[in-house]
A protein has these predicted regions:
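Positively charged n-region of N-terminal signal peptides that target proteins for export
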Residues: 1-5
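Generic detector of short alpha-helix boundary/capping microenvironments
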Residues: 8-9, 297
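Hydrophobic helical h-region of N-terminal Sec-dependent signal peptides
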Residues: 10-15
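C-terminal motif of bacterial Sec signal peptides marking the signal peptidase cleavage site
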Residues: 16-20
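N-terminal secretory/targeting leader peptides
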Residues: 22-136, 146, 156-347
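N-terminal glycine-rich phosphate/adenylate-binding segment common to multiple enzyme folds
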Residues: 139
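Glycine-centered hinge/linker elements that transmit conformational signals in sensory
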Residues: 150-152
Length: 347
């Protein structure tokens, strides 16, 4: 019932968001409609931002904080129209829309690995299994000059979007409706993956069968047995009601959920320099905010899951997991070994 209601609300939101489509809208009578120089006075701009998760997740809270700061630092001249809970589609759906001419979506919070399918070679390194050993390790990267280079990659390679800032949503873990105790129990399972070569390789390395399912269809896929398991960070697992259909989560922490907020070049170039600076500053603040809340939010949600009767399986030794996916790492760092080692050695 909860999912049906969410689907109905999503449809309504989609209709509303599509009224008057056309991406970044500038409320500046008589102004031109192309290029930064056409908005020299910094007229009010509304930017549509997509988020696949609900607002009570770590990333949803970060998005909301970012939107509030953009409005504050731009003195109200830039407004973020935040469309959460996947009403604008999956991350791949959103990226496809953003990269199309005349996009109706201007910004999005995406997983780092989402850009892999769009030529993101550097961002791919962030999603390799067991790259980051801790949150502190990730933040040493995210606050480094190297991270700034990574954020520039999509705009430098002509993708059509640019990275604004990094954040994280916690380590990702497998969850299932089956009773599992360790890595060996995943063998033969049908595990949901996105259309991502890294995750496909990871699941195969564990002896399971990767099955591509859209995020919006994952709940029903678990409910009907189309897939046996999936993986998400702890907060996202709870907020998307997955415990209702898959009550066991094993804390393998195979990947740290590195995320970034991106904006289309088209939307960026319609902003005045002052508005661009306001968004950049808001991004810096949102990144710090994300770091300040992520661990506490995750600890709180984990306690709630245990209290609700979820079967939470601890993993004391991750060595077997790391060994099982070692070939995935070796295969995907070819040509970028030095860059990858720089990240690994930041721990």
């Amino acid at each position: 019932m909860r999912k049906k209601l969410l689907s109905l609300l999503c449809c309504v939101a989609m209709v509303v968001s599509c009224v008057g489509c056309g991406g970044a809208k500038t409320d500046n009578a008589g102004a031109g409609n192309q290029g930064a120089s056409n908005n020299p006075s910094g007229g009010t701009v509304t930017l549509v931002m997509a988020e696949v998760n609900p607002l009570d997740t770590i990333v949803g809270m970060t998005d909301k904080y970012f939107a509030d700061k953009v409005k504050e630092y731009s003195n109200g001249s830039v407004v973020i129209d935040l469309q959460a809970a996947g009403v604008l589609g999956s991350e791949n759906d959103v990226l496809d829309t953003m990269l199309a001419p005349g996009s109706t979506i201007d910004m999005s919070r995406i997983s780092a690995f989402a850009l892999t399918s769009y030529g993101g070679q550097k961002s791919m390194l962030l999603s390799l299994p067991y790259t980051f050993v801790s949150r502190d390790h990730f933040w040493k990267f995210a606050t480094s000059d190297l991270a700034k280079e990574f954020l520039l990659e999509p705009s430098q390679n002509g993708t059509g979007v640019r990275g604004l800032f990094y954040a994280e949503e916690g380590f990702r873990h497998f969850f299932t409706s089956k009773n599992i105790k360790g890595i060996e129990d995943l063998k033969g399972m049908k595990i949901r993956v996105s259309n991502d070569p890294i995750m496909n390789g990871l699941v195969e390395g564990l002896g399971a069968s990767p099955t591509v399912v859209s995020f919006g269809e994952l709940y029903s896929a678990l409910q009907t047995g189309v897939v046996d398991a999936a993986e998400q960070p702890i907060a996202n697992y709870k907020s998307n009601a997955f415990p209702e259909v898959a009550n066991t989560m094993i804390l393998d922490g195979h990947t740290l959920g590195a995320v970034q907020v991106i904006i289309t070049d088209e939307a960026w170039n319609k902003l005045s320099k002052e508005q661009q600076d306001a968004i950049t500053k808001a991004g810096e603040e949102a990144s710090k905010y994300n770091r300040s809340i992520s661990q506490d939010k995750e600890d709180k949600v984990l306690a709630e899951l245990k209290a609700a009767g979820c079967n939470i399986v601890e993993v004391k030794d991750k060595t077997p997991w790391q060994n099982a996916v070692k070939s995935v790492v070796e295969k995907n760092i070819k040509g970028q070994e030095d860059l990858y080692n720089k990240i690994v050695n930041m721990k």
